């Protein structure tokens, strides 16, 4: 099964919502490269309409307010499968961050209410269960999350990593992973994104690639096994998927 097919099989559909800002690139102070969960790099960036320009922008609303958000095009953001897809596309390690360093992001503002100011939070175990506020040193401009002049524009968004920060999560075979979640306060949103980042020095680039390949292969085997046993992942509820993950049935 291809990586794209695997992603399609493991992400649930969700009610469609519009999003107006997307983190299209993220780089750590020590290198690496990534982007926000759910971002599709083929999405055109020269318009403001819902289709196709808002399809991969994340919104945190309702049941998704305290999670990883959702997009119009992909539904609920899934950390594991989407991180695999991001690494496969960039061919790079995740953004490499240092305690006391920074995560440097590019925020594409789609339309007027994708504007700043943005706030950022960090989750140290990649579960998304608990978030701590971190300092934003550079934010897209705006007042009350509105700025019509900023539509269709890329802006820098920089968040500081706290001193002595530890990261303990494992995602897509990558160890020592933290999640950084940034959003504005738009009434129709909030809009923003979630970026997976890794403590610098955790894995060599070669080890990171091997771990990613092993993780993808393991997921393919698990999906194949579930199909043989009569499971259709796309038909399962989020609670059922979470239970399968806890039982080690899926990655």
From Swiss-Prot:
InterPro entries: Egh16-like
Pfam family, one: Egh16-like
Region feature Disordered, mapped onto this chain: 40-76
Main location: cytoplasm
Compartment(s) of residence: Cytoplasm
One CC-aspect GO term: cytoplasm
Signal sequence annotation: 1-21
Residue ranges, compositional bias (Polar residues): 54-66
Protein keywords: Cytoplasm, Signal, Virulence
Positions of disulphide bridges: none
Phenotype reported upon loss of the gene: Does not affect vegetative growth, conidiation, or appressoria formation, but reduces in appressorial penetration and lesion development.
Induction trigger: Expressed specifically during appressorium formation.
PANTHER family registered for this protein in UniProt: CAS1, SURFACE PROTEIN MAS1, PUTATIVE-RELATED
Role summary: Appressoria-specific virulence factor required for appressorial penetration in host and lesion development.
Name used for this protein in its record: Appressoria-specific virulence factor GAS1
Organism: Pyricularia oryzae (strain 70-15 / ATCC MYA-4617 / FGSC 8958)
Lineage summary: Eukaryota, Fungi, Dikarya, Ascomycota, Pezizomycotina
Gene name linked to the record: GAS1
């Amino acid at each position: 099964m291809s990586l794209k097919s695997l992603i399609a099989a493991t992400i649930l559909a969700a009610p469609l919502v519009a999003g107006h800002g997307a983190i299209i690139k993220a780089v750590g102070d020590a290198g690496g490269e990534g982007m926000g969960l759910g971002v599709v790099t083929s999405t055109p960036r020269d318009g403001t309409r819902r289709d196709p320009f808002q399809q991969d922008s994340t919104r945190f609303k309702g049941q998704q307010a305290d999670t990883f958000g959702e997009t119009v095009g992909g539904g609920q953001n899934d950390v594991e499968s989407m991180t695999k897809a991001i690494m496969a596309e960039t061919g790079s390690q995740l953004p490499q961050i240092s305690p006391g360093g920074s995560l440097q992001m590019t925020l594409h503002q789609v339309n007027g209410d994708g504007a700043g100011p943005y706030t950022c939070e960090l989750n140290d175990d990649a579960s998304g269960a608990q978030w701590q506020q971190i300092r934003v040193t550079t934010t897209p401009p705006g007042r009350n999350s509105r700025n019509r002049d900023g539509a269709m524009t890329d802006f820098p968004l920089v968040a500081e990593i706290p001193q002595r920060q530890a990261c303990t999560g494992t995602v897509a075979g990558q160890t020592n992973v933290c999640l950084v979640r940034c959003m504005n306060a738009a009434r129709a949103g909030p809009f923003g994104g979630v970026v997976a980042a890794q403590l610098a020095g955790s894995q060599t680039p070669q080890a990171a690639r091997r771990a990613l390949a092993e993780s993808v292969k393991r997921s393919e085997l698990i999906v194949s096994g579930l199909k043989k046993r009569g499971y259709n992942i796309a038909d399962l509820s989020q609670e059922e998927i979470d239970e399968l993950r806890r039982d080690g049935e899926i990655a």
